[in-house]
């Protein structure tokens, strides 16, 4: 898995919630994003610039994040992100510190491979799930999950329960559809003509 470096500055938490809300508003006003690092027994509050998160957030790839908080380096993953409901700005980010001995849960992008039989027959291949949630040690998690669809016929689907990847436990619902070959009008017309 690729890694990306993010630099942050530690911050203290105000005792009263009104002071904390004011402080967070000031951070966002100055182009910063409040962040929290969980794991390893302690919770660390820090601030990162909006630009510092851009390459991590606005990408289809997954990364191990090399966090540098005031010189202290930690490996983490992006756990949660909150956006402003109207402006779509990043409001808050949660990171989770990686423990090399414990498995982590992460969403991994899906890549389809091959030309489906149903597409050759006039159907349309539709990717229903862009990411699948997996559980594994972080050094086993791949950058993407490749699903071969060359066997997929018209009207057929691939479900999460039908997939298996070495060293990964699939957490997503087993009945969730990953991809399907849907009938197009042209394919329905050809099937009706062949049936006459």
Curated annotation (Swiss-Prot):
GO terms for biological process: translation. InterPro entries: Rbsml_bL25/Gln-tRNA_synth_N (IPR020056), Ribosomal_bL25/Gln-tRNA_synth (IPR011035), Ribosomal_bL25_b-dom (IPR020057), Ribosomal_bL25_C (IPR037121), Ribosomal_bL25_long (IPR001021), Ribosomal_L25_dom (IPR029751), Ribosomal_uL5_bac-type (IPR020930). It comes from the Bacteria. GO terms for cellular component: cytosolic large ribosomal subunit. The keyword Transmembrane helix does not apply. Transmembrane segments: none annotated. Keywords: Ribonucleoprotein, Ribosomal protein, RNA-binding, rRNA-binding. One of its GO terms (molecular function) is structural constituent of ribosome. It holds the Pfam family Ribosomal_TL5_C. Part of the 50S ribosomal subunit; part of the 5S rRNA/L5/L18/L25 subcomplex. Contacts the 5S rRNA. Binds to the 5S rRNA independently of L5 and L18. HAMAP family: Ribosomal_bL25_CTC (MF_01334). Belongs to the bacterial ribosomal protein bL25 family. CTC subfamily. This is one of the proteins that binds to the 5S RNA in the ribosome where it forms part of the central protuberance. This is Large ribosomal subunit protein bL25. The lineage of its organism: Bacteria, Pseudomonadati, Bacteroidota, Bacteroidia, Bacteroidales.
């Amino acid at each position: 898995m690729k890694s990306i470096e993010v630099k942050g500055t530690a911050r203290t938490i105000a005792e009263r919630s009104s002071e904390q809300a004011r402080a967070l508003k000031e951070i966002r006003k100055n182009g910063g994003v409040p962040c929290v690092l969980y794991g390893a027994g302690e919770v660390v509050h820090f601030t990162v610039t909006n630009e510092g998160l851009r390459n991590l957030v606005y990408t289809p790839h997954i990364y191990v994040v090399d966090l540098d908080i005031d010189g202290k380096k930690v490996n983490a993953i992006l756990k949660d992100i909150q956006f402003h409901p109207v402006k779509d700005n990043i409001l808050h980010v949660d990171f989770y510190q990686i423990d090399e001995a414990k498995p982590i849960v992460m969403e991994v992008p899906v890549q389809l491979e091959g030309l489906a039989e149903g597409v050759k027959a006039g159907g349309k291949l539709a990717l229903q799930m862009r990411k699948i949630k997996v559980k594994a040690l972080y050094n086993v998690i791949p950058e993407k999950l490749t699903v071969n669809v060359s066997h997929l016929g018209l009207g057929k689907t691939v479900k999460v329960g039908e997939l298996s990847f070495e060293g990964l436990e699939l957490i997503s619902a087993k009945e969730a559809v990953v991809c399907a070959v849907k009938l197009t009008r042209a394919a329905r017309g050809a099937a009706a003509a062949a049936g006459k």
